[in-house]
From Swiss-Prot:
InterPro entries: EFG_II, EFG_III, EFG_III/V, EFG_IV, EFG_V-like, EFTu-like_2, G_TR_CS, P-loop_NTPase. This is Elongation factor G, mitochondrial. Belongs to the TRAFAC class translation factor GTPase superfamily. Classic translation factor GTPase family. EF-G/EF-2 subfamily. Residues 100-387 form the tr-type G domain.
Amino acid sequence: MRCPSLARLPNRALSGLTRSPVRLQSQNFLYQRCASTAALRSPIAGPAYQSVFHRHNLQRRNASAATTAAVLEAAASNPDGLSQEAIIDNLDPAEAIRLSRLRNIGIAAHIDSGKTTCTERVLFYTGRIKAIHEVRGRDNVGAKMDSMDLEREKGITIQSAATFCDWIKKGDDGKEEKYHINLIDTPGHIDFTIEVERALRVLDGAVMILCAVSGVQSQTITVDRQMRRYNVPRISFVNKMDRMGANPFKAVEQINTKLKIPAAAVQVPIGAEDEFEGVVDLIRMKSIYNDGPNGETVVVKDEIPEKVKSVVEERRRMLIETLADVDDEIAELFLEETEPTEQQLKAAIRRATIGLKFTPVFMGSALANKSVQPMLDGVIDYLPNPSEVENLALDRKRDEASVKLVPYNSQPFVGLAFKLEESNFGQLTYIRVYQGTLRKGANVFNARNNKKVKVPRIVRMHSNEMEEVSEIGAGEICAVFGVDCASGDTFTDGQLGYTMTSMFVPEPVISLSIKPKNSKDSANFSKAMARFQREDPTFRVSYNAESEETLISGMGELHLDIYIERMRREYRVDCVTGPPQVAYRETIGNRVEFDHLLKKQSGGPGEYARVVGWMEPTGKLEDNKFEEQIVGGSISEKFLFACEKGFNLACEKGPLIGHKVLGTKMVINDGATHMTDSSEMSFKNATQQAFRKAFMESNPSVLEPMMKIAVTAPGEFQGDVISLLNKRNATINDTETGVDEFTVYADCSLNGMFGFSTHLRAATQGKGEFTMEFSHYEKAQPQLQKELIQKYLKAQADRHKK
């Protein structure tokens, strides 16, 4: 074992990290040494030597406990001074081996890039499943990770699915080593982006899949942004090398230019399209082929085919040059004009990948069962194990100061619930264990509400199947039954006041009214609504008191359609829906000053509150701001708190069309109170009234959501597609033309995109596809604003007539 990196630990923690010579030797070695010495002695001396072993073992345990305690103190008191190397170096040897053989990875990509097909091959080659089945359920079985009937019918992944498998990798010395992989397959469609968000929040690494024909696509850019948000290292896999028009090096170039990540191929394909045979490994300089009915046999040859030798030499040179830009050791060798060894290249790629400076690019075809196993080797070689990733929590006992989580089983337990699912046995909660051990029957505490819950069952998930286990260690992913919580909740064993940041949840952009067709289905309807909200943070349910309608909101038409269909299938509730409604927003126009007095007297205690100040735009169409600039205490602290509450309530429902307010700032700098009639309610109401009056005097505007759109279709339909976008007042930003197809990138209002998929299919003979995601809010056209305001005023008038 290497010497612990004590120099990297803060001084205050060093006292507990004194190296013991016993710690450097394994228990087995000590036992063998004592036993072998005892064999030369008389039998009477045996117990004495046995006691020596126990004494050494006790010393080792005590030293290990002291080291662990010191690391924990350093993690809490000075997380910036505690390096991951120090955490790794001071791991218990058995723990170090376990974590070094563990990978938590996700597979993410643009829709239809082959994520689920690739995952199916991974499960087959690791022995997790016995036969390969295809997406869309064409063989009446369907891919293992698409367990929902809807997924198999539509050929898309709707929910992220977790599994685990073991990959046996041959080391450089020819020895086989078993690695444990926790794998999450994610959806590619933007409507289900929350599934990607919560998967990447808890994973240590990812495989980003690209199509060899299309390269970097719109959703690839979204996935890249999500990976950056959570600092997830990735390797890239250029899939579909057997497709017509495959050009893997275009994909490599686009990773560099579009995603702005230094990338280089670590493989060169042998042939392409229908002549794709295998790949050349640029690090080992060997050819790799697949043999057998399903490509299960990997054949490695020393000979590199003559037809690709020049490309191999050029791409290896480019790999070394790219690494020299991101890794100091390779840079030194490059300047010295020294050829790096295989081990030096691998180490550099690993360092740069984990450091988020580089992504190695692999190539293959999952559908053709070619070159998937080398990609799995890349997962092991270049993606981090849990001990190599920095994970932080907030200590609520110390004003939410940052603390570093240490993946030792011996530490107090900390875990994050990242996904909820309803099953036949109750709520299933997916948990990533960051620190300590989660045991069956143990009590854990929810950091959000400090509620104690018992863990009755722990399981490992394999898509929709499960295996029961008694405990889960640090760095692992599992699911538990019977734990009532929300997605994003932190659990601890009660010793620590830690909480972790949840995943990013985007705001819904589309709504529609919904009700059950038959009133007798109301109970099941309510049950379904409650479940779907609990499972999916981007699916919202609200009740509009004015129209007396239930509204569901989500990320797009497909998102809501899927839930309506699930309600029909899973709860046998047929629903009636209204037309889609856009999530408009309102914003202030100009700065407006206000001086508002609320004064009521009706026999009993009255109401009195005066608020003075101004409202103005914040400068960005984002969050609202409330400030108090009271001098002299004209309004007390508790009444100012009520003012802020009134401001926030007013922003929830704007005066213009009844939608949320954005980009508005309110400042209160004076006011007055009454000795007996002033109350928190008075100031809350006064602030709301002042807000509405000032807002309407400011020349306010209605904002509409703008969407980023990418439309891909065969080249002969380019004119029709652009005409279609122009009719919707879309702003075309860029056009890319490929061999057989083109892609148009545009911005368009969500209001203009309703029904677009139907018109696109008609214009392209069913061959076009598009993706869209929320971009930003901007002012709606004056005519649309006028129509929306008139509609709102009419609805208000009709309501008052009732």
